[in-house]
Every structure is written in C-alpha cells, then in structure tokens.
C-alpha cells in the first residue's frame, strides 16, 4: 500500500494550510470569545471554492474527491474548530444528500448555489428526545394536497440560523415491519424564510463557540410536495447515509484539532524554561509528545482510509464505508480529547488561560466525541459489523 500523497493532494493541502493561517487563525480567538459566526470567513471560503470541494463541476463544484475535502476540514480545524465544522456540516450533511438522493430538478435548484457558497446548508435530525434513535422522532410531515405540512422542532443544529437550505427528517406515517408498528421516516428540503419555519434557542456552548447552533421550529410549515428528498419512507436510510459521510468530516475536524494542539505545544515547550533549561529537554515531556504524535498519525491513517473508501463508493464500487467512517470518527475524536488535554497539562497554568490556543482547542475537541453519533454509537456500529 502506497501511503505517499500525490502531488495534487500536496498542492491542495498547501492551499488549505495557507488560507487557514492567513484568513482563519487571526479570527479564531475573537469568534470564540464573542460567540460570533465568522460570516466574513465563510464568504472568503466560498470564493476559494471550499464549500463545493467534492461536488462535480457540472453542478458548480470543484470536482475533487472526499480525501481532498477531508484535508480541507483538517487544515481549517488545526487553527479553528468552528470553521472546520461549518464546512463539514454544509458539505457532508446538506450538499451530499441532495447530490446523492435528489431529483435532477432538486440538484439543479439547490446544488450550484450551495457548492458556490452563495447559500449555506444544514441538517435537521436531532430532537430533544431523538438523535441516534430515529424512531424517537416527533416532528411530523402530513401531505395536504400539493403541500407537506411540517410540525415539530429540531435542536443542536449546526449552521442553524446562518443556513439557507436545510435537510429535515420527519415522520410521515406508521408502517408495519416484521410484525411491529414503526414510524415511517422521510427526508425533506426546507428553505429559510418559509412561513411557519422559525428559530428558537441559540445554544450557549462549551466549545466551537463561533458555530451557529440553533433550535429549528416548524409550526404548520407548508413546503411543496416536491420538497420530499428521495422516496417517502426512506428518510432513515438517507439520514444514516448522511451521518456516515458526516463522520468522515468530524473525524477530519478532530484530527486537525489534535494536530494544531500538538504543533502549538511543541513550539511552547521549546521556549518554556524550568530549572534552567527548556521543558522540551525533560524526558517526561519528550515521551508525552512522542505518544501523542504516534496516536495522531494513527488517527490520520484511519481518517484518510475512510475518505478513500467513500471515494471508491462514489466511483461505483460495491463497497461500504460505514465501519471505516465509524472507526475514524471514534479514534480521531478520542485522540483529539487526549491530545488537547495533555497539551494543556504541558502548558501548566498557561494552558488554562484563554490567551493560549490550547485552552480553546480542548473545549472544541470535546464535541467531536458527541455529534454525528457519540463514541458509544461508533462502537455499536463497529461491533455490529463484527458480530453480524
């Protein structure tokens, strides 16, 4: 197996890294402290084509693969976890399901504007009583003539109030499967500004504070009949497919956060002096850094493998990338939490001060163990595959 990256990946990586250092890093502390969505950064990313990386050129995207997209999220997240998740939620959770399951008319209507960054996307699955458990969904969609009527709410929605296009999962009936009555789940495309669609609570979060995380509320919200995404009753499959891809994005985010924390800590320990010498000369420091670097490299291999596996799938190969995505997300997220925690420790008291990036990075890392399926859910996915 060749682990070397082709020249095209190195060029893309350098572009993402340069943009992150010049355009994202200078604002990272400010947007965290002010809990401010970085609209100006999103507009710049749109000009660079970062919001349509894996979308075909025919639909207005860059025509690149999932690995290139993962590298973009990784490099952005090295300096700002917020910016990384904005791109991930937009691309994996909104653009991808429309490209994969949308009708030609839906693709033509929505994808070019999303891929160009003219519009931003979001995904509404989670509810107060339903996340991983799709059967716990309470949001309902009832067909009334030529319109669907949505009622219910969604919570913890990334890109919440800033998005323009939303994929919304709702109950469309009751069906019987294997002798059991179950909720029929369907997916819909909903636009901001639709009457009956409003925003509720803005979440005051521990980390990724610049991310717009809102409650979505639907009160007799009428959307066209053709807003149904995919087939009626196939919403669960669409949601699971979407989360599989989303896990690659979050794994890349976690990887980037871990890499950023290690990089800033290596620079810090070289300069920090104790007992007449830099703490980089202490064996304890060296061993901690060695362990963290090794785990980061292992996480990177898992993330890149999952991205390549999805590329194979999208090229028409009869393969699944669900387990690879779960493994990458599980391991990268837990590594990010370990790396950032130990990097704070190596900073000593300064690691607890907001002026130092590792403090923010540790707070940002925690959410990667939670959204797009908790670490426990990833273990369920992996073990189910082993035991089938």
Which role does the model predict for each range below?
Residues 49, 73-77, 170-171, 190-195, ...:
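Short Ser/Thr-interspersed hydrophobic loop/turn segments at strand-loop and sheet-helix junctions
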Residues 92-100:
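Helix-loop "lid/cap" segments that line or gate small-molecule binding pockets
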Residues 117-125, 169:
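A short, Trp-centered hydrophobic/proline-enriched beta-strand micro-motif
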Residues 129-132, 156-159, 178-180, 205-212:
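Short Gly/Pro-enriched turn/cap motifs at secondary-structure boundaries
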Residues 136, 193-224:
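Flexible, small-/acidic-enriched active-site or ligand-binding loops
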Residues 146-147, 151-199:
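A short core secondary-structure module
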Residues 219-238:
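Long, acidic (Asp/Glu-rich), low-complexity accessory segments flanking structured domains
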């Amino acid at each position: 197996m060749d682990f070397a990256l082709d020249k095209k990946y190195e060029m893309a990586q350098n572009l993402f890294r340069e943009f992150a250092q010049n355009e994202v890093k200078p604002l990272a502390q400010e947007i965290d402290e002010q809990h401010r969505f970085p609209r100006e950064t999103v507009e710049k990313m749109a000009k660079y084509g970062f919001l349509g990386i894996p979308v075909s050129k025919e639909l207005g995207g860059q025509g690149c693969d999932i690995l290139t997209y993962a590298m973009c999220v990784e490099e952005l997240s090295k300096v700002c976890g917020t910016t990384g998740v904005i791109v991930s939620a937009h691309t994996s959770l909104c653009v991808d399901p429309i490209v994969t399951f949308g009708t030609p008319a839906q693709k033509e209507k929505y994808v070019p504007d999303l891929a160009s960054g003219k519009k931003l996307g979001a995904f509404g699955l989670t509810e107060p009583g339903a996340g991983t458990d799709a059967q716990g969904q309470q949001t309902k969609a009832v067909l009334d003539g030529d319109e669907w009527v949505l009622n219910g709410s969604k919570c913890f929605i990334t890109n919440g109030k800033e998005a323009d296009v939303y994929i919304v999962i709702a109950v469309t009936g009751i069906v019987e499967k294997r002798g059991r009555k179950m909720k029929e789940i369907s997916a819909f495309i909903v636009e901001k500004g639709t009457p009956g669609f409003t925003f509720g609570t803005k979440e005051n979060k521990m980390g990724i504070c610049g991310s717009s995380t809102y409650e979505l509320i639907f009160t007799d919200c009428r959307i066209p009949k053709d807003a149904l995404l995919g087939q009626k009753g196939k919403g669960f499959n669409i949601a699971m497919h979407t989360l599989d891809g989303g896990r690659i994005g979050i794994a890349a985010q976690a990887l980037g956060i871990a890499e950023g924390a290690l990089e800033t800590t290596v620079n810090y320990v070289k300069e920090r002096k104790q007992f007449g010498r830099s703490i980089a000369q202490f064996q304890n420091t060296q061993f901690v850094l060695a362990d963290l670097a090794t785990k980061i490299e292992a996480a990177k291999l898992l993330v890149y493998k999952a991205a390549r596996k999805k590329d194979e799938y999208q090229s028409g190969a009869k393969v699944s990338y669900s387990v690879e995505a779960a493994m990458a997300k599980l391991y990268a997220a837990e590594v990010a939490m370990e790396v950032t925690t130990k990097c704070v420790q190596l900073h000593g008291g300064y690691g607890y001060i907001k002026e130092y990036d590792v403090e923010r990075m540790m707070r940002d890392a925690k959410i990667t163990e939670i959204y797009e399926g908790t670490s426990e859910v990833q273990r369920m996915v992996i073990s189910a595959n082993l035991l089938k």
